[in-house]
Amino acid sequence: MVFRIASSPYTHNQRQTSRIMLLVLLAAVPGIAAQLWFFGWGTLVQILLASVSALLAEALVLKLRKQSVAATLKDNSALLTGLLLAVSIPPLAPWWMVVLGTVFAVIIAKQLYGGLGQNPFNPAMIGYVVLLISFPVQMTSWLPPHEIAVNIPGFIDAIQVIFSGHTASGGDMNTLRLGIDGISQATPLDTFKTSVRAGHSVEQIMQYPIYSGILAGAGWQWVNLAWLAGGVWLLWQKAIRWHIPLSFLVTLALCATLGWLFSPETLAAPQIHLLSGATMLGAFFILTDPVTASTTNRGRLIFGALAGLLVWLIRSFGGYPDGVAFAVLLANITVPLIDYYTRPRVYGHRKG
């Protein structure tokens, strides 16, 4: 009998960083397609701008640090950062905003800490928050979904608005944001928060065109379901684990249900929280970032639950309509503490 002698490693895992990132990029296709369908070609233009900006910014920093540019860019992490930021901002936001946010995310939030694996905060969400705080008007100027929109920009119009601020016929963002009722439309979460503060009843708010969807906001419910489909595929491919998405969604649903039962006239119903804004994108594509999330199974459950609670608190009582980005970054801060207290006990070790 011949025994084969081999050196370590004795187990082989094909889940290299580049492959996992590629799986996440592929899983984003349904969500991207849904956003293209409901919000137009601007989403694709923003993705292209963000992708090019991310690759150039990363290449520049790597060149300055005298590191291999080609080898690092092949891990696809820069592309994923650009993609996540691009789908998080309004589709017709000015071109310089997505470039600025992407460059900030890659250089400051990622490479300044040492590159992939060293950054404590999700780079895409850092870029998003910087843009949201600096340019709140542009970052909240979402188009109405095509089913309730009056003016639907084509591909050429989308490019012209992004780069010049006007369509070929002279239309601007105020014109494009008009809904079928002649009123500028906002996202379902923004509409709900603004209307409640204006003294409108929930019954009145639910009559707005933006809530004409079957389950939640028009268009947004299908966008979230598309991101959910991509997330389920990631779970099936074992590219992510179930702990964070499940604990995040369960906690958000539980908090939203309890809040709605106690104060139905001022707080949004659970289906609006689950199927509006960046809920499913955050649950499966942002919170599950292996670098900035907890690394233990118990820690992942705590991390996801904390993020779900923070999203509900910010949406319900904060100054911003959608709290996913802030919740992710606040939860990122707690990761070292969570990991410290959820470390698996070493076999045979007793607490001293």
UniProtKB/Swiss-Prot annotation:
Segments crossing the lipid bilayer: 20-40, 42-62, 78-109, 123-143, 148-168, 214-234, 242-262, 267-287, 301-321, 322-342
One GO CC annotation: plasma membrane
Domain of life: Bacteria
Biological process according to GO: electron transport chain; transmembrane transport
UniProt cross-references to Pfam families, sorted A to Z: NQR2_RnfD_RnfE (PF03116)
Subcellular location: Cell inner membrane
Membrane topology: Multi-pass membrane protein
Residues recorded as bearing FMN phosphoryl threonine in the entry: T187
EC number assigned by the record: 7.-.-.-
Phosphoprotein keyword on record: yes
InterPro entries registered for this protein in UniProt: NqrB/RnfD (IPR004338), RnfD_bac (IPR011303)
Keywords for the protein's UniProt record, in alphabetical order: Cell inner membrane, Cell membrane, Electron transport, Flavoprotein, FMN, Membrane, Phosphoprotein, Translocase, Transmembrane, Transmembrane helix, Transport
Cofactor(s) for this UniProt protein: FMN
UniProt record similarity statement: Belongs to the NqrB/RnfD family.
General function of this protein: Part of a membrane-bound complex that couples electron transfer with translocation of ions across the membrane. Required to maintain the reduced state of SoxR.
Subunit structure of this chain's protein: The complex is composed of six subunits: RsxA, RsxB, RsxC, RsxD, RsxE and RsxG.
HAMAP family xref list: RsxD_RnfD
Protein's recorded name: Ion-translocating oxidoreductase complex subunit D
Upper classification of the organism: Bacteria, Pseudomonadati, Pseudomonadota, Gammaproteobacteria, Enterobacterales
